[in-house]
Amino acid sequence: MIKLQEKYDIRSYFEQYTTFENKKVLDFGCAYGSFLNFKPHQNYTGIDVRADCIEQNKKKWPQHSWIHCDAFNTMYNVNGTDKLKLTSTYDICVSFSVLTHMRLDDIVQTVSTLKEHCDNLYLSYYSNKDKFAYETICDFRNIPKSQWEDINKNLMFYLEYGNLLWTFFDDDYIAQKLKARSCRTSFGNDDYRGLQRCLVI
């Protein structure tokens, strides 16, 4: 069984336990580069399926490397055709709320690729034990809350609404699948994406 740490803000976790100085950092699913807002870094690469994010980031932070990957993603890139390909290696990979919107087969394949190119991975996900996270998503997206019992009883559960997908995992199940240990995370209550655990691989 995976031991869960106490709740913490993942930003504080990075400040306390992760040394980024002189490290090559890959931000997988970087979106608009929010990682740089709380952890400025010199040797940073952001990768995302959204071309508009990458183009905007190139203008805002031209000193960093930005990669557009046209990979399939149920929520953000349904027409994507590529698989994740990396040509460099990195000391650290961070990924916030990306596994949340992927199916298990895609997660396993993606994490396998990331592990080949990154020494340390920090990947967030939703737990099937966290009713508050589930209810917060439902409130935020106007989704009926009738599925919690199903989510709570399964090792893996997909909550689909229109073309949106949220994936919930049993902690031990996903940690075993990805050969990881799990840490408990908590952002502020105003950010539902932060109500996640973080796999440390």
Language model feature labels by segment:
Residues V94:
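A conserved beta-strand element that flanks and buttresses the S-adenosyl-L-methionine
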